[in-house]
Amino acid sequence: MALIPTAPAPVAATTTSAPAGLMAQPFTPARLAELRASRTPVLVYMTADWCLTCKVNERGALADAAVAAAFKAKGIAVLEGDWTRGDPVISQWLQARGRAGVPAYVFYAADGRETELPQILTVGGLTALG
């Protein structure tokens, strides 16, 4: 189920809800391009304060210590986009992937492969990335 915001964002994406263990950076297309150019594996996740599925994932699988440890060991960077107010940069990223709303999770492997993850995340699914 995709959710759509009701008010436009006045500013660019900011990080507000990333689980502390993942050390997420704010999503920008430029930062994603930099990480991909350096062949760094990246998990991009788009969230919103009003998205219940997002919050379940953030308090569950994304907050799990095993996920944080696996990402650290594998050098996986995390970029979080906050779509709470309908940020147009995030809207464009979502639309480019045929998505109408959040949650949205995409893993970019070091070899360039892109994998869209399910809307409900699991610890096993996340620790298997990379």
Show the residue positions of the predicted features.
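Proteins that catalyze or organize thiol-disulfide redox chemistry
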Residues: M1-G130
